[in-house]
Amino acid sequence: MTLRLSAIDLRHSNGTLALRGLDLSIERGERVAIIGPSGAGKTTLLNLLASALPPSAGQLEVLGVNPWQLSSRQRQQLRSRIALIHQAPPLPARQRVVTAVSAGKLGQWGLGKSLLNLLHPLDVPGARAVLARLDLADKLFERCQQLSGGQLQRVGIARALYQAPELLLADEPVSAMDPRLADHTLALLCQHAIEHNVTLVASLHAVELALAHFPRIIGVRDGRIHFDLPAGEVERQHLDTLYANEQLSPQQVCEVAETVWAPRC
């Protein structure tokens, strides 16, 4: 079991209850997409799973342990086994791409090796290889400020893949990419998860991409799990109620539910 949540609540410091009574189990090697309207709690849920935020109530198990019963050092060691791909990767503007990708290993290296890597990248071939999978090998020595939003997202993905985590979390990882590139990139993430038996959990606004690439779909609304279904069982009525009052036309929902349902990986 990779993830287990039981009666989880999470309240932000401003008093907002972002997650309410979540019960969820995800097995090792599963590929799960989280969908739902803006403000539903998708990003908060991923941060909870990454052990970046503690629950306010309930029981949480990540990779076999409760992160918040560990010491700070033990929790940091746990986080080195987890990668979180951000929608807007926090990459320093003047940092070179090779250094940004190599940073995926910082949690696994000692202080001395980490500092040395900042001065002189220690594994240029490894960084180049993972960037090549994302068609970015030619950007190896460019600065992050020279890249487009979609390219920065792919650098963030490359860093996560270079880290080689057991649990891969992705928060809107392809939102800045054109449809074709987004499709290709999600296929690559899924294939990586299959080949390495990695648990992959991704939040996506593009319902059609979620249904096309992920065998299991979790719909989240108002901090609650609205449905948890195999992709092939997600129907129009599920999406209608999930996105009620949102900017998703009935025609779009119908097309998604009827034509895009079989996972590709």
Swiss-Prot record:
It comes from the Bacteria. Residues 3-247 form the ABC transporter domain. Keywords: ATP-binding, Cell inner membrane, Cell membrane, Membrane, Nucleotide-binding, Phosphonate transport, Translocase, Transport. One of its GO terms (cellular component) is plasma membrane. Coiled coil: none annotated. PROSITE patterns: ABC_TRANSPORTER_1, ABC_TRANSPORTER_2, PHNC. ATP binds at residues 36-43. GO terms for molecular function: ABC-type phosphonate transporter activity; ATP binding; ATP hydrolysis activity. The complex is composed of two ATP-binding proteins (PhnC), two transmembrane proteins (PhnE) and a solute-binding protein (PhnD). This is Phosphonates import ATP-binding protein PhnC 1. It comes from Pseudomonas syringae pv. tomato (strain ATCC BAA-871 / DC3000). The gene is phnC1.
